[in-house]
From Swiss-Prot:
Catalytic activity, reaction form: (2R,3S)-3-isopropylmalate = (2S)-2-isopropylmalate
Chain ranges passing through the membrane: none
Involved pathway(s): Amino-acid biosynthesis; L-leucine biosynthesis; L-leucine from 3-methyl-2-oxobutanoate: step 2/4
EC nos: 4.2.1.33
Family indicated by similarity: Belongs to the aconitase/IPM isomerase family. LeuC type 1 subfamily.
GO molecular function, one term: 4 iron, 4 sulfur cluster binding
Highest taxon of source: Bacteria
Pfam families associated with the record: Aconitase
Protein name, UniProt field: 3-isopropylmalate dehydratase large subunit
4Fe-4S listed as a keyword: yes
Subunit structure: Heterodimer of LeuC and LeuD.
Cofactor(s) this protein cannot do without: [4Fe-4S] cluster
InterPro entries, per database record: 3-IsopropMal_deHydase_lsu, Acnase/IPM_dHydase_lsu_aba_1/3, Acoase/IPM_deHydtase_lsu_aba, Aconitase_4Fe-4S_BS, Aconitase_4Fe-4S_dom, IPM_dehydratase_rel_enz, IPMI_cat
Source species of the chain: Pseudomonas savastanoi pv. phaseolicola (strain 1448A / Race 6)
Amino acid sequence: MAGKTLYDKLWDSHLVKQRDDGSALIYIDRHIIHEVTSPQAFEGLRLAKRKPWRIDSIIATPDHNVPTTSERKGGIDAIEDQVSRLQVQTLDDNCDEYGITEFKMNDPRQGIVHVIGPEQGATLPGMSVVCGDSHTSTHGAFGALAHGIGTSEVEHVLATQCLVAKKMKNMLVSVEGQLPFGVTAKDIVLAVIGKIGTAGGNGYAIEFAGSAIRDLSIEGRMTICNMSIEAGARVGMVATDEKTVEYVKGRPFAPKGAEWDLAVEAWKDLVSDADAVFDTVVRLDAAQIKPQVSWGTSPEMVLAVDQNVPDPAQEPDLVKRGSIERALKYMGLKANQPITDIQLDRVFIGSCTNSRIEDLRAAADVAKGRKVAATIKQAIVVPGSGLIKEQAEKEGLDKVFIEAGFEWREPGCSMCLAMNPDRLGSGEHCASTSNRNFEGRQGAGGRTHLVSPAMAAAAAVNGRFIDVRDLIQL
């Protein structure tokens, strides 16, 4: 009998009941909620005269709609948009009513859900974690079973602590070798998506493995797992190791004392067995990966910074040719145009993909002693949480960014999506450390280019894309 994959083990340990239709009922250990997908769920509970089943499993914070400027100091009443204001207030009201732990808008622990969960130790190895947000796969970096759910499922988990789900197939993405200098976790995951496409992971849980993945920090692994959904997979994960344990140790929600010792012992099994069989295996050579830049309207439309935008005339597949033509038109680019010739208008460093302290340090290393190019209308840096902001300010990173001409903001989802005041104007090109680049994602008519934090900072000071390795030294 073949061994089990990490996903198999996590699934089996949370399986409550297998159903005749092929679906199953699984138990949920951690439920994270925010202001956008939870209001309807709580209203559904009230209409059914139910209450949340397990209050201590839930943590909450507003992130999508909160302003990242000084406006937020005025509290909820200072939020200009009426819908955003109502959603943030409703989250507060619901959490207050049921006694749910919430890091409110001006709490120093507030931040993006997928940043604060791990930061607080609320995400632990071996857990099942859900949130009404597709980038919940981020938490899989801890050897956890984590994925996004819809609003009706948010209500179901609140009411029952269980979720109806169907087991996925297993995919292994193995990245072996040493990453070249200046190449990051973001470049790895963009390269993976470029290789398998945005539908490549459909129906799979992806385990990221190999020496290049093991060499990454936990923050880097979170970046990788965060964008599993852009590869088509709801679930992405990395096996637990000493780095995982060290990251979790001592955090507010982490086990203490004898419970900690028991947990660490149990976590040792959160790896795929040596004889486990995967349905699909994808391999990448880390040494061949270069800094990546997305050029089109899908994360799979991505190239190395030293390449040229594709020519649709060279694409034999008519469907793909049409997609390239539409993307070029929307993005305002020409066939065979060098990536380094793309003129930028704005730069955004932040999001649940790349707003952690490691990301800010990487961007600051590039920005230090330089100035944002005169052609850049705006360059903003948005920490993923209040605690990350505090740490960055202790290290003087805020001063580095401000002196270079960046705006230093309060935590939130910000320009990742056009649900708050931070957004692109029509036709504007943005170098963004976020995760999605489809039409209108950052604002109606906005043109998004996905890059790493270091590449975004390099683009800010250069005005166009440039290989960050041309600016920094070994």
